[in-house]
Amino acid sequence: MLNRRNFIRTTSALAASTALPGYAFGQSGPLRLEITEGVIEPLPFALPTFLAVGGAEDAAADVSRVIAADLRGTGLFRQIPPDAYISQITNFGAPVAYPDWQAINAQALITGQVEARADGQLVVRFRLFDVFSQAPLGEGLQFVGPADSWRRMAHTVADQVYSRITGEGGYFDTRVAFIAEEGPKNARLKRLAIMDYDGANVQFLTDSRSIVLAPRFSPQGDRILYTSYESGFPQVYIMDVATVQRRPLEAIPAETMTFSPRFSPSGQSVVFSLVDGSNTDIYSLDLATGTRRQLTQAPSIETAPSFSPDGSQIVFESDRSGNQQIYIMPADGGEARRVSAGTGRYGTPVWSPRGDYIAFTKQENGRFHIGVMRTDGSDERLLTSSFLDEGPTWAPNGRVIMFTRETPGDDGAPAVYSVDISGRNLQRVATPGMASDPAWSPLQS
């Protein structure tokens, strides 16, 4: 077994954004934060609390706080304390006093307004400025939604800011499925749960009467695959996130052990591991027709399949060479090639949404690591090292990874951590107690 944990594993509501009427902003200025492997000096930004209209003071403060937290949390941005500001924003459409922001070394300025409408809708408007070029950075936008969607609108603004400055897609308006755990290590209760990427808005999707493991989002974010022991043995279930209705995968013989599921990029089929006698192989299942197909046939354990973004290939782990290694095969099965080339044991491979890297868990010399490698096995880099790090999951922009970290000892507690693909900005993700097996959703908007 690759891991130390005691379970089977071998290893809404927002309207469309619109350009603000009356603001015909020009082309983006030269401000650009390049994401490289070198030392990064966080980009200083100023974010005055958004103006409030119609009694939206609390919402304006909350939206501003979440946007700032999103940007700071990347490790790429540094917020200049508001008490250092020389200028005060009193009119959303007023000209920017660039010299005042240059004087405090702000490189980016984010201004905004939150309006509470009589119909219960909330309108969030924002503008982004390149301070030293003295020019807007892209168009001003507004987002409209129910008042209780303010957090999503804040994340969406942060995604826009992140994207315009880095040139990469954002990842803030996302959710994370995970396993919420409680109780002693030898009798731990597990529930499937979902939350915003920053730990807010936690919702429990199952009770704790049976063990649940390994949730995986569909490409559309509307369904979750996971493994449950509610029948007494591991079986893959599929759940509708909106209704919380669940069912086991169809066309699977009764009392057949299935686990380690993953959706295809189209969401129309799934792959998973199935135990048949003494052998464990990878199968695919067409969700519309129920057609099941065996993809591997080696006399070994094949598991943890993950599709390439274009759906043409599957990366998986196998012990066919004597210990666990990473292999790639065509999506319809066929000859597999080994891509892991280092020492140690490799498992839980996951293809990056960008298609450029494969993330994995590695065990070597009594330590566990989260690492990345190119899809041909080259450029292997270990991003973390601890008593137990496992189960990477990619942010939708392919630049940040979440994973499970567990502390040693009889009371070892699992927690969710994140790290960027250069190994920087390692931090614990807020969860309501112990948590494991994170799975990142696609962007919601």
UniProtKB/Swiss-Prot annotation:
Keywords: Cell cycle, Cell division, Periplasm, Signal. GO terms for cellular component: periplasmic space. Part of the Tol-Pal system, which plays a role in outer membrane invagination during cell division and is important for maintaining outer membrane integrity. Residues 1-26 form the signal peptide. The keyword Ribonucleoprotein does not apply. It comes from the Bacteria. Belongs to the TolB family. Pfam families: PD40 (PF07676), TolB_N (PF04052). The Tol-Pal system is composed of five core proteins: the inner membrane proteins TolA, TolQ and TolR, the periplasmic protein TolB and the outer membrane protein Pal. They form a network linking the inner and outer membranes and the peptidoglycan layer. GO terms for biological process: cell division; protein import. InterPro entries: 6-blade_b-propeller_TolB-like, PD40, TAT_signal, Tol-Pal_TolB, TolB_N. It is found in: Periplasm. Its main location: periplasm. The keyword Cell cycle applies. This is Tol-Pal system protein TolB.
